[in-house]
Amino acid sequence: MTHIRKSHPLMKILNNAFIDLPAPSNISSWWNFGSLLGICLILQILTGLFLAMHYTSDTTTAFSSVAHICXDVNYGWIIRYMHANGASMFFICLYMHVGRGLYYGSYTFLETWNIGVILLFTVMATAFMGYVLPWGQMSFWGATVITNLLSAIPYIGTNLVEWIWGGFSVDKATLTRFFAFHFILPFIIAALAMIHLLFLHETGSNNPTGISSDTDKIPFHPYYTIKDILGALLLILALMLLVLFSPDLLGDPDNYTPANPLNTPPHIKPEWYFLFAYAILRSIPNKLGGVLALILSILILIIMPLLHTSKQRSMMFRPLSQCLFWILVADLLTLTWIGGQPVEHPYIIIGQLASIMYFLLILVLMPTASTIENNLLKW
């Protein structure tokens, strides 16, 4: 008799995705981040749901409702900080996941990769709108600055910004709609993640060597279920250390001041996970140019498969490309640091150089290094 997990219509889907799935025998811990992102998403949806039960999306009460959650709701403080820091963990996992994809050439799975890029944009949009909800100073001014970027679009820009605001400034209408979008988007992300997984399971996972692993597969369960559980425990440990010991480490003190349209904070900056893109935006002295650079800094991921000139898929056996990859990582860390600094010398020039370096590495240096490595193989 066939086991129920192989015959039941629903169980069969789960079985083929998480139990009897043939997986490469050599995938490293860099392949853990997919499941960790799933855990982050579930955690964010659950904590967000409980926060939404007590939050009010009105400009007059939003700030005090968050204070009420922290001060009066049973365990409200831990739910709030798990949600805020959960977003940081989400982005750490996200950047590691994308970095893994770049290093090991996973972007050759086109559908999986493209849906992944769409997911990245959606998560970034969700996080941005979530940051506006507590209605502190940085919430308000962050929303004002970022939405205002759309006014750089020729002809329709100003109308577009006012349409998004629902008025002539960031106000009640903006906060209400941001809350509505922030609530719905995670469910869209969950649906996209399932499609992401569906396309991945069409091809099977990549592995560190980049060579086909069809001849050497092992079942996902128990080997990778136990590995994912270890990853999950480490993720939760890191999150809870952050939440319980330094919950405000990654936040901005300005957000503990209620939003005031008449008083601009000295340094407007987004959360840490957007600083690299913010630095690229600021490094161009033209508004439209900056906005384009900002969008392209992430949209560039879409063309990664076109920039792959190597005869090998993975960077495992390509020392030149490895070197450039880690320079790119260092460059992104530099941009993250610059994004949090004031706009003054020497930060301006460092930001501009790091921005040029970012695009130069991806568009020119890495494809060139790959071609050189191809020629070295002939020797």
Curated annotation (Swiss-Prot):
- Which cofactors go with this protein? heme b
Q: Which InterPro entries match?
A: Cyt_b/b6_C, Cyt_b/b6_C_sf, Cyt_b/b6_N, Cytb/b6-like_sf, Cytochrome_b, Cytochrome_b_C_euk/bac, Cytochrome_b_N_euk/bac, Di-haem_cyt_TM
Statement: the UniProt record of this protein carries the keyword Cell cycle: no
Please tell me where heme b b566 binds in this chain: H97, H196
Q: Name one GO cellular component term.
A: respiratory chain complex III
Looking up Gene3D superfamilies in the UniProt record yields: Cytochrome Bc1 Complex, Chain C (1.20.810.10)
Q: Where is a ubiquinone bound in this sequence?
A: H201
Q: Does the keyword Transport apply?
A: yes
> Any further remarks?
Heme 1 (or BL or b562) is low-potential and absorbs at about 562 nm, and heme 2 (or BH or b566) is high-potential and absorbs at about 566 nm.
Q: Which family does it belong to?
A: Belongs to the cytochrome b family.
Protein name (Swiss-Prot/TrEMBL): Cytochrome b
- Source organism per entry reads Syncerus caffer (African buffalo)
